[in-house]
């Protein structure tokens, strides 16, 4: 049986732009993508901390070191410049689950620069439920 787990997240990034008339996606600074192990065109889930909106889309790579976190397409209606968002990626793992499992969390500052990279750890799968 496969289970879906958090693979990585970019925590509390600031939206730097929105472009409604674009064919969907989210542009993210390539350095942040690399740190969070996110590939171009990978599916992501976004949560807007300011308004509670949650949606899924795919990633487009933005210039490395730019701090860009731009919502594009119809989702531009779900976030405004300056909003705080959390970006999630997930992974499907066949049981038995490797223990410990270590999702990666990329913490950023107000300019979307990496301030810290953490690894959430649990000694057994049941502990994952309480550490996320």
Curated annotation (Swiss-Prot):
Annotated active site: 25, 58
The family this protein is said to belong to: Belongs to the PanD family.
Subcellular location: Cytoplasm
Annotated catalysed reactions: L-aspartate + H(+) = beta-alanine + CO2
Primary role: Catalyzes the pyruvoyl-dependent decarboxylation of aspartate to produce beta-alanine.
Protein name: Aspartate 1-decarboxylase
Transmembrane segments: none
Matches recorded under PANTHER family: ASPARTATE 1-DECARBOXYLASE
Residue numbers binding substrate: 57, 73-75
Pathway this chain belongs to: Cofactor biosynthesis; (R)-pantothenate biosynthesis; beta-alanine from L-aspartate: step 1/1
Subunit structure: Heterooctamer of four alpha and four beta subunits.
Cofactor note: Binds 1 pyruvoyl group covalently per subunit.
Modified-residue entries (Pyruvic acid (Ser)), positions: 25
Top class in the EC scheme: lyase
Keywords on record: Autocatalytic cleavage, Cytoplasm, Decarboxylase, Lyase, Pantothenate biosynthesis, Pyruvate, Schiff base, Zymogen
Single GO cellular component term: cytosol
Pfam families per record: Asp_decarbox
Record PTM: Is synthesized initially as an inactive proenzyme, which is activated by self-cleavage at a specific serine bond to produce a beta-subunit with a hydroxyl group at its C-terminus and an alpha-subunit with a pyruvoyl group at its N-terminus.
Organism: Rippkaea orientalis (strain PCC 8801 / RF-1) (Cyanothece sp. (strain PCC 8801))
Enzyme Commission numbers on file: 4.1.1.11
Cofactors demanded by this protein: pyruvate
GO biological process, one term: pantothenate biosynthetic process
Chief site of localization: cytoplasm
